[in-house]
Curated annotation (Swiss-Prot):
Keywords: Cytoplasm, Glycosyltransferase, Purine salvage, Transferase. SUPFAM superfamilies: PRTase-like. It holds the Pfam family Pribosyltran. Pathway: Purine metabolism; XMP biosynthesis via salvage pathway; XMP from xanthine: step 1/1. InterPro entries: PRibTrfase_dom, PRTase-like, Pur/Pyrimidine_PRTase, Xanthine_PRibTrfase. GO terms for biological process: purine ribonucleoside salvage; xanthine metabolic process; XMP salvage. Disulfide bonds: none annotated. Homodimer. This is Xanthine phosphoribosyltransferase. 5-phospho-alpha-D-ribose 1-diphosphate binds at A128, H129, G130, E131, A132. Converts the preformed base xanthine, a product of nucleic acid breakdown, to xanthosine 5'-monophosphate (XMP), so it can be reused for RNA or DNA synthesis.
Length: 192
């Protein structure tokens, strides 16, 4: 998605440890117009999949997730990183390691929001090692839901997550595919 790649070039910052900081439009401050375009692109890519729900993970998956769900005309469910007191004990749990924050999280979704009738589109902000996506796939599996596809805003192709998702038989669409951060510059797949 050219618009997204241009925005990453303009406002993204490569940090130590192969981290891309895009907090001016996605991971802290959110650009709703850009996220609407992200949602439209996910709709275009997955509209033939009979999606019943979008599943994402808090917090940075919510903006692209809600826009994709809005465009597809379906609800969005987000996995929580902490179980609030209002959540009952009927939940699906999965362990997720965050490479950015260097912490283990337990994510959860209340069981009443996912079922074997669901055809899920999993959406996330980044796909690097694939830990968040693996956790959401685990939750979908616990619910006996069908995963129609995985959509990510940014895939860091050199960190193995994309390969893992595809090797496990899931349809994957990434709106911006990064090949490397050579010389602290973002290089997209397919560039010379």
């Amino acid at each position: 998605m050219k618009l997204l790649e241009e925005r990453i070039r303009k406002d993204g910052e490569v940090l130590d440890g192969n981290v891309l900081k895009i907090n001016s439009f996605l991971n802290h401050q959110v650009d709703p117009q850009l996220m609407m375009e992200v949602g439209k692109e996910f709709k275009r890519l997955f509209e033939n999949e009979k999606i019943t729900k979008v599943l994402t993970c808090e917090a940075s998956g919510i903006a692209p997730g809600i826009m994709a769900a809005y465009q597809l005309g379906v609800p969005m469910v987000f996995a929580r990183k902490k179980k609030p007191s209002t959540l009952n004990d009927a939940v699906y749990w999965a362990d997720v390691f965050s490479y950015t924050k260097k912490v283990n999280n337990k994510i959860c979704v209340e069981k009443k929001f996912l079922s074997s009738d669901d055809h899920l589109l999993i959406i996330d902000d980044f796909l690097a090692h694939g830990e968040a996506v693996k956790g959401m796939l685990n939750i979908a599996d616990q619910a006996n839901a069908t995963v129609a596809g995985v959509g990510v805003v940014v895939a860091k192709e050199f960190q193995g997550g994309s390969e893992w998702v595809k090797d496990h038989g899931y349809s994957l669409e990434a709106l911006a595919r990064i090949s490397d951060f050579e010389n602290n510059q973002v290089h997209f797949v397919g560039e010379e």
